[in-house]
Design a protein with these regions (language model features):
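Bacterial N-terminal signal peptides that target proteins for export
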Residues: 2-12
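Conserved, well-ordered active-site substructure
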Residues: 230-260, 351-413, 422-452
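Short, surface-exposed linear motifs at loops/turns and structural transition points
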Residues: 28-145
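C-terminal motif of bacterial Sec signal peptides marking the signal peptidase cleavage site
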Residues: 20-22
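Short glycine-rich loop/turn motifs
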Residues: 179-184, 267, 326-328, 368-373, ...
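Active-site-adjacent helix-turn-beta-strand microarchitecture at beta-sheet edges
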Residues: 230-363
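Zymogen propeptides
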Residues: 146-287
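Short acidic-glycine loop/turn motifs at beta-strand connectors
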Residues: 188-191, 271-278, 332-335, 376-380, ...
Length: 452
């Protein structure tokens, strides 16, 4: 399924710009296949769409050319630079998988790959197993205004049962005029006395029960999404990887048009290596488990991407986590929140930046449940965060608000974890957050600080 240009770019329904394949010395090719040499088969909207978290481009590829090259591993995409002559050696992002039904494509270039305040130049490319072909026409674009961090007045709690290297804080400062209660714990897990661990159990348990199992547990919060049958996503415990992140429904509402559509997607993962150094990446599995420095930019209502691989969405990073667990979305990457709630115009849940295909009861501009998040600061300190929601004292947080709260705490990288009734923080043996709305929920996994 392809996104209609008159929906996503209503202001751009103008005469299309024809991108003529440049096959001369500028592109490093003197000989080109006769079947596509000199053919204008890509049409590009004359303007890029700027959002606070991305630049969006729309183009159309001649279907006959795609079909003629299906045996040559065809790929389309966008490349960009800052000096006006982009080639894939500068920066590029492959587009959706090309099939016999491909044609109009919409491609989102995430702020993870761009810097605020800079002007970029974009052009389309098409390549097969032999050649790379560039369009002559180039489109200018830049990110919109960067969202601002959210800061609160925090009170440090008295926690004599914890090592001095672990601190816990509380706030009841209002969030955008709403009642709000939140807690966070912070520690340097590269220190000599505290480490971070992930727990993944063979039976479902409350966070309280999981904390009580180990007297070395200092602070523990819930972690991954789950079903009754077990934890979802990818986890790493003691260096051993398990699980998968592959494809997801476009919507979990049976009545939604995208309920029966599936999209490959990466999901956010937080973890530490054997030295306790924290990292945040996107993870996906396509025959193996991969970690990436960018999301697969899947777009609901548009053509799906190919499965994650050693090339898509990029070459994997070389990361060997000792403890890690996925959920999502990534809230912060290099200090930038890579999503907002911009809609494509196709209807409810058709978000421009829900790359991780997060369900409607978690991702949305009116969804404010309890939240759990984990992140780390520029100097490597890990922060475990929770907030209450859906109760009189605390009305919860949007995911975009959660990202800016984590940024306000000094985080440069952060991941959202399961929330709602799953959200719990245990400090020592004490539960921090509200438990009146729902009995303590059993969960399959948790993440926290432990004495060494």
């Amino acid at each position: 399924m392809s996104m209609r240009s008159d929906i996503i770019f209503p202001a751009l329904v103008l005469a299309p710009v024809f991108l003529v394949l440049a096959c001369g010395p500028e592109n490093g090719r003197e000989d080109t296949p006769d079947d596509i040499s000199g053919v204008s088969f890509v049409k590009l909207a004359p303007e890029a769409m700027s959002t606070p978290v991305s630049v969006v481009l729309e183009y159309e590829i001649d279907n006959d050319v795609i079909v003629e090259n299906l045996t040559s591993y065809p790929e389309c995409g966008i490349c960009w630079d800052t000096d006006g002559t982009p080639v894939i050696e500068d920066n590029f992002q492959a587009g959706p998988k090309l099939t016999r039904n491909s044609g109009k494509e919409t491609q989102v270039i995430s702020n993870v790959l761009l810097d605020y305040g800079k002007t970029y130049y974009f052009r389309a490319y098409f390549r097969n197993s032999r050649e790379v072909y560039y369009s002559e026409d180039i489109v200018e674009g830049r990110l919109g205004e960067e969202p601002s961090e959210i800061k609160f007045d925090w009170t440090r709690l008295d926690t004599p049962e914890l090592p001095s290297s672990v601190s816990v804080y509380f706030t009841d400062s209002p969030l955008d005029g709403r009642p709000f209660n939140a807690w966070y714990a912070v520690a340097d897990v590269t220190s000599s006395d505290v480490e971070l661990k992930v727990n993944l159990h063979d039976r479902i348990k409350t966070v309280d029960e999981q904390a009580a199992e180990d007297p070395k547990c200092c602070v523990l919060v819930n972690a991954a999404y789950f079903l009754a049958s077990g934890s979802l996503g990818i986890s790493v415990v003691g260096g051993s990887e398990q699980g998968m992140v592959t494809t997801y429904r476009g919507s979990l509402r049976p009545e939604h048009p995208e309920y029966n559509s599936v999209y490959p997607a990466t999901r956010g993962i937080f973890g530490v290596d054997a030295d306790g150094v924290p990292s945040v990446y996107w993870t996906g599995s396509g025959g193996a488990i991969y970690y990436y420095d960018r999301p697969l930019p899947s777009l609901i209502g548009s053509d799906p991407y190919a499965m994650m691989s050693p090339k898509l969405p990029s070459a994997p990073v070389d990361w060997e986590p000792e403890y890690a667990i996925s959920a999502g979305p990534v809230l912060l990457y290099d200090g930038k929140c890579p999503f907002d709630f911009t809609l494509t115009g196709q209807g409810e849940e058709y978000y421009m930046h829900n790359f991780e295909m997060i369900p409607y009861d978690i991702f949305g501009d009116d969804v404010r449940p309890d939240r759990t998040a984990v992140g780390y600061t520029e100097d490597g300190r890990v922060i475990l965060f929770i907030c209450d929601g859906r109760c009189e004292k605390s009305h919860g947080a949007l995911l975009t608000e959660l990202a800016m709260i984590m940024k306000g705490l000094g985080c440069t990288y952060a991941v959202n974890y399961d929330g709602g009734g799953s959200t719990r923080m245990i400090v020592g043996s004490k539960n921090m957050n509200d438990v009146t709305a729902e009995a303590s929920r059993q969960v399959w996994s948790s993440i926290g600080f432990y004495r060494k």
